[in-house]
Amino acid sequence: MASSVFLSSFSSSSSLQLCSSFHGEYLAPSRCFLGAPVTSSSLSLSGKKNSYSPRQFHVSAKKVSGLEEAIRIRKMRELETKSKVRRNPPLRRGRVSPRLLVPDHIPRPPYVESGVLPDISSEFQIPGPEGIAKMRAACELAARVLNYAGTLVKPSVTTNEIDKAVHDMIIEAGAYPSPLGYGGFPKSVCTSVNECMCHGIPDSRQLQSGDIINIDVTVYLDGYHGDTSRTFFCGEVDEGFKRLVKVTEECLERGIAVCKDGASFKKIGKRISEHAEKFGYNVVERFVGHGVGPVFHSEPLIYHYRNDEPGLMVEGQTFTIEPILTIGTTECVTWPDNWTTLTADGGVAAQFEHTILITRTGSEILTKC
């Protein structure tokens, strides 16, 4: 989950300014789904961990009121008549149904019981043989759930119905839907439609032919999280949108291709940026990949854009890569629910995500089904 991915932060580094065209700042529960630059490396050049103090994470973004949202929709409609780039109708909030229940016998991640939003763990997650077997099981389940969710994407289906189906499949497998209750997130999956970059909350809005939708699934099984997402087409989709989605998936593949024991993390962002720019798309810098395993979000933070951050991959590490590409701006606005994050200009966004395991000669995609 990204989205985060699902990580968030705001550091003093000048290399990243979250939603920098906006003046207001606010603290949001979604801070554990967004990312900002690492100010110190967790690994030395020898591959050993360096010690440092945990960073404080928060999001800096424009939180829109009801009036501002109405103005945004009006401006988007005006753009529809002037722009040569096709735009779907502006995304509108639907009704969010009550939180679904999870049977008592299913183990919960620690953050659910405590009710406290966890900090980003500074520990790299290297599970070991037994842990890797459990990671494979969690990731395989997440991949199967995501495949099933994709079959439900049709015109007139609501994202709330997709959430219910995903929730039921996860608990039937004896697992817990990791997003549910994370920092107050009210649903079991993220559904991000059209201009929604990430962290869309499932609601009563019906999908329409021409929509694209990212579904982000994370499951907690036997003490380990498996995290993956994919962007799907609903009905007849514009060729320009299809191209964006194709290139985004290719960016993920190219980022994964550079991963192996001893490789530099910054190679991921370089490879993704090169491919996106070749087609004229923009890479969102605010959302990062992250370590995943027994802990939902941890170091290393994976930047999907060009960067000079130090750090080397180590055999046995597990983390996500989850680039988001946009047709237009990468600036964002966040709805009052403190989660749903949209492109500021209404341009569509696409995202793909895998959890990978670093090996001596390359990497293994754990969420490939």
From Swiss-Prot:
Its main location: plastid. HAMAP family: MetAP_1. Binds 2 divalent metal cations per subunit. Has a high-affinity and a low affinity metal-binding site. The true nature of the physiological cofactor is under debate. The enzyme is active with cobalt, zinc, manganese or divalent iron ions. Most likely, methionine aminopeptidases function as mononuclear Fe(2+)-metalloproteases under physiological conditions, and the catalytically relevant metal-binding site has been assigned to the histidine-containing high-affinity site. Its cofactor is Co(2+); Zn(2+); Mn(2+); Fe(2+). Gene3D superfamilies: Creatinase/methionine aminopeptidase superfamily. Its EC number is 3.4.11.18. PROSITE patterns: MAP_1 (PS00680). It catalyses: Release of N-terminal amino acids, preferentially methionine, from peptides and arylamides. One of its GO terms (cellular component) is extracellular region. Keywords: Aminopeptidase, Chloroplast, Hydrolase, Metal-binding, Plastid, Protease, Transit peptide. Belongs to the peptidase M24A family. Methionine aminopeptidase type 1 subfamily. Signal peptide: none annotated. The gene is MAP1B. It is found in: Plastid, Chloroplast. InterPro entries: Creatinase/aminopeptidase-like, Pept_M24, Pept_M24_MAP, Pept_M24A_MAP1. It comes from Arabidopsis thaliana (Mouse-ear cress). A divalent metal cation 2 binds at D227, H290, E322, E353. It comes from the Eukaryota. GO terms for molecular function: initiator methionyl aminopeptidase activity; metal ion binding; metalloaminopeptidase activity; mRNA binding. Ubiquitous. Preferentially expressed in green tissues. One of its GO terms (biological process) is N-terminal protein amino acid modification. Removes the N-terminal methionine from nascent proteins. The N-terminal methionine is often cleaved when the second residue in the primary sequence is small and uncharged (Met-Ala-, Cys, Gly, Pro, Ser, Thr, or Val). A divalent metal cation 1 binds at D216, D227, E353. Residues 1-61 form a transit peptide. This is Methionine aminopeptidase 1B, chloroplastic. It is an enzyme of class 3 (hydrolase). Substrate binds at H199, H297.
